[in-house]
Structure formats: structure tokens, C-alpha cells
């Protein structure tokens, strides 16, 4: 009878110890080949120097026109706050109700985010906090506040009508919607004394109905040629059964164009049967800085990856070229574990080198990029912010995944030149072409090729309620940062898996 194995012994621990020895052996190989270490150091230097020179050579212009700065929200960030507003001053609690039509544009088109609805605002000063319940041209009923908060209600078809109601109770404003004016459903509640407000909500506030219509943006590219079109629009909506319950003054509705932009239509309020027709132009929305500090500060990563990939390829092809792979495999009959050990070592070392490269590149590039612009060109993002840390650490992870992918290619092709050429075609060539291809094709490359990993560098906030054009040359990727990084990780896993399959079934 076989005696039971003592606790803590057995095949599994020995296997783990064996793999640890393989990892140590591969690490010893890497650190004793001076050319490989020097190449990794070169990758760090290239990343840092290219990023620095790019920052020193970059120039950005801000359009000030000698006028006053634009409005800012309660958090001090620039916002858009221009719309056509018909209001009365509500002194205390109260309710405003109306049946609102979906806004329609003039002959220049209707933006998807054209808005018509009810509004309670701390004042008519641009940037003041507000609660707005609206019908949009393509996105149904929405309750918005603080320029970034957006709560979806029901869908409303083009040409449709919806009853809307805003009820003020102290600093709390609650939005309701109804299809028939009898059965009401709550959309959400806004606290005008919340953490995003500049102070206590005033006792007397403007309350009424509004219309706004954002610019229509379009950019077309056809293999090097580009056209940019951004034009203001005017939208109109009808408001029936308008009613303001509560103590209010004056007796008549007062019309004002909030924002006062002379380049825009101030809008017009016209009585129409039992209600009003109101037209307007502008937007109530957050603004996004025109440039992404992380993307520009990490410009050198796109060249540094070539050297990192070269080390990944050489880490396996050098043994094939010199015949050492037979000795390596003879010491470990389970061939797959050898390649996995190499992947662990090259991935970890490349990640460490990437951290040094990305953090140093940011530290030397951020100040030249920021310059002395006022307002700041890149918003107020700093190294301590989560998105910036994600961009820096994520870029190091991109370099590590590229090294692992290159290792897999080297094991598959068993030729240094061929494997490095594939890396250049897969990564460098698409990054060069993204700025010249038609947008739809460029976005496909960004989504479904390994360059998707660079989406992790994006730090600009995205707001679903703001229509924007995503341009690859500005570092914009159509997918989220983690989705892009997972796409690259998937490619690395597939290539490494294919290399493992081939290594197990063919002679070295």
C-alpha cells in the first residue's frame, strides 16, 4: 500500500517550482545578453526624447479674439451655455408645465441634440446651475443639470409631442413626463444645492421654457484630402398649455437670448394659438479641451515600440538561429512551458521599461506642452488624476503586450527579419495611415487591429449628450480605453497560443 503524500508535497508544487526555474533561467539569458538590455534602454530613450522633441516643436493656437473668456460651470471648467429662454421669476416653490413638440431645424438641418423643454436656472447668467427637462430631436426625453449630468426618459418619435413638468421644492427640482397630461412618470431629481453648485440656490429663480440647437459638425477625408464643416443651426418648437403655478413675476413671459453670442440667432418668441412658438440656437453642454495632454506627451511610444518588439523577437529567434533552442527544450520536455516562461520574462521586463519611459516622457513633456496658455490648453488634468495614471501605466502595458506578441511571432516565423517586418506592418504602418484614411476606414483599423491598444492613452472626458467628430490624428479612438487594451491583449494571446501549438507539434 502506497503511503499518502505529506501535506505540502506532490506533483503540483514541483511543477510550479519547475516553471519558476524556467522563468529564472530565461531572465538570466535576457540580462546576460548586453545587446538586448541596451536595446531596451534605447527604447526608453527613444520614447522620452521623441516625446520631448515633439512637445518642444508643437504649437497650438487658441482663439480668443480679444473678448472675455467663455462661461464656466460650478467646477470652474469651460461650458457652453447659449439658448433662447422665455421665463418668469419664480419666488419660492412652484411648478412649470407644458406640452412640447420635438424641435425641428430650418433648412440647414436638425442636430440630433436639438433641445426644447422646461428650465429652472439659478440666474440667466451663462454658467449658472440649472435643471432642464427636454425633448430632443433624436434622443427622446432627457433631464440634464450641471452641464454633465444626463438622465434618459422615454423615446419620442420625430414630430411627436410630450407633456413635461418641473417641480421646485426648495433646492430640489424634480422632472416628470406624460404622454397624455394625466398619468405622470418621474424622470429624475436635481439638487441645485448639490456638491457641483457654486453655493445655496437663490430664493427667486427664472423658470420657463427654452430651445437650443447645437452646431452641425462634419469632416470628410478621402486618402489625404480633408474637408471640415461646422455651421450654426436654428431649431423651433411649439409649447402648448404652458402653465406656471406658484408665486411668480411678471405676469407676462419675458424672452432673452442667454449667452449673447452675436454670431448666433438670438431666437424669437411668438404667440401661437393656445401656446407659443420658440426658436433658438446654441447649446447647453460641457466643452472638451481641444488637445489630449497624455496622447501628445506620449508621442514617442509609437517609435519606442519598434525596439521593444525587436527584443521580443530576438529573445526567441536568436536561439533558433544558433541552435540553442534544442538544448533549452531538452532541459524541459514540456515545450510550451519554455515559451510561456519567455513570455513572462519579456512581458515583465518590457512593462518595467515602459513605466520608466512613459512617466519620464510625461514629466519632461507636460510643461512645454502646457506653456503659458490662458485658458489652459489641456484643462486641469494632472499626473495624480486617474485618467492620466491609466494612460501612463496602460501605455507601459501596451509595450509589454507588444513584446509578448512579437515573441509569439518570432516563435511562429522563426526568422528575425520576417517577425520584425510583421510588427512594423501591424503597428507602425496603421499608425502612420490613420491620419490620412477616410474616417470610417480609420475607425475600423482603430477598433479591430492591434493598434486598438493605444486607446488606453485617451484622457479626454466623453459625454454622450454632446455630438463630436472623433479624429485619429487628435488621438481619439472610437472605443473606450479598456476595450482597446483588451483587443491588443486578445491578439497577443492568440499569437502566443498559435506559437505554443506549433512548438508542440514541430521539431525545433
Q: Where do the protein language model's features map onto the residues?
A:
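Extracellular glycan-recognition regions
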Residues: 15-292, 313-316
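Residues that define the loop-to-transmembrane-helix transition and helix capping
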Residues: 37, 336, 417-418
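Short cytosolic juxtamembrane segments of multi-pass membrane proteins
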Residues: 503-508
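Helix-capping/transition residues at the boundaries of transmembrane alpha-helices
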Residues: 29, 317, 328-330, 406, ...
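Hydrophobic/aromatic positions within or immediately flanking transmembrane alpha-helices
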Residues: 40, 326, 339, 420-421
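Transmembrane helix boundary and interhelical loop/hinge segments in multi-pass membrane proteins
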Residues: 312-336, 343
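Central hydrophobic cores of alpha-helical transmembrane segments
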Residues: 41-42, 419-430, 446-451
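Secretory targeting signals
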Residues: 2-16, 41-76, 80-82, 143-147, ...
Amino acid at each position: 500500500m502506497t503511503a499518502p503524500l505529506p501535506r505540502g508535497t506532490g506533483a503540483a508544487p514541483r511543477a510550479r517550482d519547475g516553471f519558476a526555474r524556467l522563468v529564472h533561467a530565461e531572465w538570466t539569458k535576457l540580462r546576460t545578453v548586453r545587446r538586448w538590455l541596451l536595446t531596451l534602454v534605447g527604447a526608453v530613450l527613444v520614447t522620452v526624447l521623441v516625446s520631448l522633441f515633439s512637445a518642444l516643436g508643437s504649437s497650438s493656437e487658441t482663439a480668443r479674439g480679444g473678448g472675455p473668456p467663455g462661461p464656466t460651470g460650478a467646477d470652474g471648467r469651460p461650458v457652453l451655455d447659449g439658448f433662447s429662454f422665455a421665463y418668469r421669476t419664480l419666488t419660492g416653490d412652484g411648478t412649470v408645465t407644458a406640452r412640447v413638440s420635438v424641435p425641428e431645424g430650418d433648412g440647414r438641418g436638425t442636430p440630433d441634440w436639438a433641445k426644447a423643454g422646461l428650465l429652472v436656472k439659478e440666474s440667466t447668467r451663462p454658467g449658472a446651475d440649472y435643471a432642464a427637462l427636454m425633448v430632443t430631436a433624436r434622443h427622446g426625453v432627457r433631464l440634464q443639470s450641471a452641464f454633465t449630468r444626463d438622465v434618459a426618459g422615454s423615446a419620442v418619435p420625430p414630430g411627436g409631442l410630450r407633456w413635461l413638468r418641473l417641480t421646485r421644492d426648495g433646492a430640489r427640482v424634480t422632472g416628470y413626463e406624460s404622454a397624455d397630461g394625466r398619468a405622470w412618470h418621474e424622470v429624475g431629481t436635481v439638487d441645485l444645492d448639490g456638491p457641483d453648485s457654486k453655493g445655496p440656490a437663490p430664493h427667486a429663480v427664472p423658470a420657463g421654457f427654452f430651445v437650443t440647437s447645437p452646431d452641425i459638425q462634419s469632416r470628410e477625408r478621402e486618402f489625404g484630402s480633408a474637408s471640415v464643416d461646422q455651421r450654426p443651426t436654428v431649431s423651433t418648437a411649439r409649447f402648448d398649455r404652458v402653465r406656471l403655478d406658484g408665486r411668480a413675476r411678471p405676469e407676462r413671459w419675458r424672452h432673452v437670448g442667454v449667452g449673447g453670442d452675436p454670431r448666433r440667432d438670438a431666437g424669437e418668441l411668438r404667440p401661437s394659438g393656445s401656446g407659443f412658438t420658440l426658436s433658438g440656437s446654441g447649446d447647453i453642454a460641457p466643452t472638451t479641451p481641444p488637445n489630449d495632454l497624455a496622447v501628445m506627451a506620449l508621442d514617442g511610444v509609437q517609435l519606442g515600440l519598434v525596439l521593444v518588439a525587436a527584443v521580443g523577437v530576438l529573445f526567441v529567434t536568436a536561439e533558433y538561429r544558433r541552435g540553442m533552442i534544442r538544448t533549452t527544450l531538452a532541459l524541459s520536455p514540456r515545450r510550451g512551458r519554455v515559451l510561456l516562461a519567455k513570455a513572462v520574462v519579456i512581458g515583465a521586463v518590457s512593462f518595467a521599461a515602459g513605466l520608466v519611459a512613459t512617466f519620464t516622457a510625461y514629466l519632461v513633456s507636460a510643461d512645454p506642452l502646457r506653456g503659458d496658455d490662458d485658458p489652459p490648453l489641456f484643462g486641469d488634468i494632472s499626473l495624480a488624476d486617474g485618467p492620466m495614471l491609466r494612460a501612463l501605466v496602460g501605455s507601459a502595458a501596451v509595450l509589454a503586450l507588444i513584446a509578448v506578441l512579437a515573441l509569439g511571432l518570432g516563435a511562429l516565423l522563426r526568422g528575425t527579419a520576417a517577425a520584425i517586418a510583421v510588427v512594423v506592418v501591424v503597428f507602425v504602418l496603421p499608425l502612420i495611415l490613420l491620419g490620412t484614411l477616410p474616417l470610417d476606414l480609420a475607425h475600423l483599423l482603430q477598433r479591430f487591429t492591434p493598434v486598438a491598444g493605444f486607446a488606453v492613452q485617451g484622457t479626454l472626458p466623453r459625454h454622450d449628450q454632446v455630438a463630436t467628430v472623433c479624429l485619429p490624428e487628435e488621438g481619439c479612438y472610437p472605443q473606450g480605453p479598456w476595450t482597446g487594451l483588451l483587443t491588443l491583449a486578445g491578439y497577443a494571446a492568440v499569437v502566443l497560443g498559435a506559437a505554443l501549438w506549433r512548438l508542440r507539434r514541430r521539431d525545433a
